[in-house]
Amino acid sequence: MSVLFQLLIAAFVALSFAMIIGVPVVFSTGDASDDANKLIWGGAAAWVVLLFVAALASIVVI
């Protein structure tokens, strides 16, 4: 279970870095297409899901 928790945290950190870099790049291009908005909202939803899953996993691991 500890390895799964570490993988969840690694995925959370990787997605956070991707969002930190990706969101400003998408907004600075000036292209407000639906695909870009869906990508940003999808990444934000995945970030929130990973946050809650990692929080629940931390309760089980500790």
Curated annotation (Swiss-Prot):
It comes from the Bacteria. The chain crosses the membrane at residues 8-28, 41-61. It is a multi-pass membrane protein. HAMAP family: PSII_PsbZ. May control the interaction of photosystem II (PSII) cores with the light-harvesting antenna, regulates electron flow through the 2 photosystem reaction centers. PSII is a light-driven water plastoquinone oxidoreductase, using light energy to abstract electrons from H(2)O, generating a proton gradient subsequently used for ATP formation. Belongs to the PsbZ family. This is Photosystem II reaction center protein Z. It comes from Acaryochloris marina (strain MBIC 11017). The lineage of its organism: Bacteria, Bacillati, Cyanobacteriota, Cyanophyceae, Acaryochloridales. The gene is psbZ.
